[in-house]
Amino acid sequence: MISPARDPGGPVQPGGPVQPGGLPAAWHRDWAAWASAASIVAANVLAVTGYPVPFLGPALGFWFLVVHPVYLLCTTSVWDGSGWAERLGYSLGAVLLLALLGGLGLNTVLPPLGVGRPLDPFPVAALADAITVALYLFRRRNPARPSWRQCLASIGPVGGRMTAGAGACVALAVLGANRLNNGAGGQVSLIAQGGILVLAFLLLRCRHRLQDEMICVTIYLLSLALLLMTSLRGWYVTGHDIQTEYFAFQLTYSHAHWDISSFSNAYNACLSITILPTELAQVTHVFNPYVFKVFFQLMFAVCPVLGYTIARRYYPKWISIMAVVYFIGFPTFFTDMPFLTRQEMAFMFVCPAILAMTHRQWGLRRRRLALIAACLGMELSHYSTMYLFLGALTVAWLAESGSRWIPQRWRGTVGAEPAMAGGAARDSRTLSIGAILTATVIAVGWGGVATGTMGGAVADAGAVASSLIGKTAGIRSGDVAYGLLPGSGPSAQTLLNGYRRQTMGQRAGSASAAYLPAALVARYRTPAVTGTQAMPLTAAGRLLAAAGIPVDGLNAVIRQAAARGEQLFTIIGLTAILFVRRGRRPPGREYLCLCLGSIAMVALITVLPDLSADYDVLRAFQESLLVVAPVLVAGSCLALRPLGESRAIRAAAAVGLTLFASTIGFVPQILGGYPAQLNLNNSGEDYNTYYTHPQEVAAVNWLSSQPGVLPAGVQAENITDRFAFTSPGTVSGQQVIADIYPTLIRPSSWVVLGYSTIHTGQSSVFYEGNLIAYAYPLGILQASKNLVYNDGGAEIYR
């Protein structure tokens, strides 16, 4: 018997053929669209009313502003020729750029129309609706041929187990961070790290039974677990740069309006930490620190996935997986990046830029337009990332242009994709002088003309020039010690003496009564504290020590070997690409030149004076790993080639995983004898310096309620802005937190001592690119001021 729905001769039911359940077939096909529409309505209601729905409300708001628009754009035919991970990278970058530009448009257009708070929930929700409708209509006109359901159907048992294991690591990372925040131990976080190590090994072992999509899902979850271990530490904003980022965000959020003049600082020019988090906060209505702690990490965890996709352009699975292991195992990824959310968002534009430049199936104009759009997003997100990327592009263009001077016998098809050898290789060049100049105009236009915050870069250029011609000595960050040829920098005490001389010069330019008397200050010494206290040896560490293995030095040796080994492997890999051609398929010319440009920028920051202090060399190397990590892995394999090809691959993987186990903190935590890491302990330098305690928050709230605080001034350990007023009623771009170094204390100021200074007797200053700890003389405050607040974790003197 033929049902009416399938009977070509039967009457056509209104709304289409009827399924056995009694509903039209179109309803069955479009159930996802109806569910999405209902969710959008619910998200709008929750965003505008602010009605609290724990967990579900914030998740729905994030889906509304980011996830659903990304899905709509990802499932269009505009990305034909790209895999799903690459589609995700392009789509996420495009949606973030739309959110940045759309928020900037609201901020610019609405105030002249009488809307004083253009970034309130209603305008932001309307913007999200407009983006959703536009992308939905675009998707209807350009539907994607492949279906995401096909990807789900091809998961397989191995992929399912890998995904479940990686998801468990994320859950353990969240639980472990919460346990540490409640004063418990780091055992759960350590188990999560162990799971990450096991799954990284299984990814390599089972790579032939896994499709690239499932490898990408596993990489995403493992990366997210590492990020959340750090970002979720503390119930408030914890970290270094993120304190100032949060301050800039609160200025925008509290007024629902971004104004560069309210805080004339380069941080405030980064829309990724002003307008973007304000939009997220207005539709999620979550406790504001968790916009940075959770939602930014959910987006940034896509970056290693895109790194894998970049590597898969030219390299097999095992090299691409190991490239990701080196990328997420580099300490900057999980110890610094969660505290550098503006750079996290900038990386979300770096990756699509690299993918677009090396896309062989796209036309030249399309690649260049994608590159320029990515540069715009980069500049709006983070100035330093844009400067480094622009420098890398310039070097890459010079390298490409100079390749025509290579003798003919060496030229051949070196650096060209196999499908683009010969004359087509030259036609495939994305970089041009026009593209470089356009990117430069974007950087100067936003940083120089629109916001006037490019002065730091100009000053750095002048300082470098002055150092090179011998007028000044120049300064270097202590991080350059991790280079292949480290220099012997000044001692901590020498640096602290230089800081003291600088503060004395500052005093000399002011009235004598502006600071505490010099005779009083001279009675209190501030010796530098050298060395970081290591964790005690564990049972496993004591066992190794009893066997004659110096555990105290072992971890440090492994870290140094990791730093220098990665640089050495990169050099070997690049040398092989450039000069060893026999039997090897060279990567693309564009990719090779990008590698050269990235390494050149890291080298310049390391070698040139002053740059390493303002443009962190470790962060620059993290950015370079997006392109050079697979070259690094290939170089490690070549270095071990005397073992035989098969054994060299296994040995290279073993070396990479061993370094990974050490750099993420697993081995030091198991053995002890190494400084404690914040993601695993409630101790250590980062914990003492950057962790925000509830008592400190209570002290700042009490201080903000006192009359006449800002005119009198506030002094605190100012390597971070965690003592700045950030609540909506008190945040002000005019507030300045002066340092508490004894020579800078003013008689009438309020002096705030944090948890670490009270309990360890130490404070820190950041000088010439170095963090310097010193013994703080509490007696100078007791002799010159009155203790007006003490809650056991913070003290305030007046």
Place the predicted regions along the sequence by residue.
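Active-site lumenal/periplasmic loops and adjacent helix-entry segments of GT-C-fold
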Residues: 55, 61, 182-184, 203-217, ...
